[in-house]
Design a protein with these regions (language model features):
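Short, high-confidence coil segments that cap the C-terminus of an alpha-helix
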Residues: 15, 61, 88-91, 182
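Hydrophobic/aromatic residues located in beta-strands of well-ordered beta-sheets
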Residues: 18-20, 64, 121, 184
Length: 213
């Protein structure tokens, strides 16, 4: 699964370097055996953003991209959409969203995002946002995909900020940025992904990947 994510990232022409960041000896051995560039990070990284920050301590770059290793359906088009907002120098952090399928709207594992007209994220939630009070059924809900791009300064600030109350309630690390006044801009993609959190997710993804071979 990690190899699929790694190769998808390598296929994105906008990325200069791709690394697997892990605190697992098993993953590091797998990466070395398959010629996948990897670095070892501390075990106490509480989130993916903390792990990318650990990498940034020793590897310099202007922009860092965070792709979860359990997202094997990530494709280069996701990364193009992710990095598009970063072309604007005032954007410090970006992420990606896709139109939410009807059966996912009320699923707390499908994180929803609402944005301003300029693409700036107003809030991320496991709840159904926005709430359709009058049942108008005309709302285009958007599902957040857990990939991020950060400018170095924003990434360096993240671990120095105290975990926010919203972050603790929702278990969503990106809310720490928002609560501390660091805007996140959201790129749009038509391509959904499936994070592998359960055996059922794994079977679904394996079926999709087998069709693409």
């Amino acid at each position: 699964m990690i190899a699929w994510v790694y190769r998808a990232a390598r296929a994105c022409s906008l990325l200069d370097q791709v690394l697997i960041a892990t605190d697992s000896d098993e993953v590091l051995e797998f990466a070395n055996a398959h010629n996948l560039a990897a670095v070892f990070t501390p075990e106490d990284c509480a989130s993916g953003t903390d792990r990318v920050h650990a990498v940034a301590e020793s590897i310099g770059a202007d922009i860092y991209v965070n792709i979860q290793g359990d997202e094997p359906l990530v494709r280069p088009e996701h990364l193009d959409a992710l990095l598009e907002p970063m072309a604007r120098p005032e954007v410090e952090v970006s992420t990606v969203a896709v139109r939410c399928a009807p059966d996912q709207i009320n699923n707390p594992n499908a994180v929803k995002v609402v944005t301003a007209q300029d693409g700036r994220a107003l809030y991320f939630s496991r709840a159904t946002i926005p709430y359709d009070r009058d049942n108008a059924r005309g709302i285009a809900y958007r599902k957040h995909l857990g990939i991020y791009a950060y400018r170095r300064d924003a990434l360096q600030r993240f671990p120095k900020l105290p975990p926010s109350s919203l972050e603790a309630a929702e278990k969503l690390e990106q809310l720490r940025f928002l609560e501390n006044g660091i805007d996140i801009y959201v790129g749009e993609t038509p391509y959904d992904t499936i994070g592998v959190d359960t055996e059922e997710d794994l079977r679904t993804v394996e079926a999709i990947l087998s069709k693409d071979r």
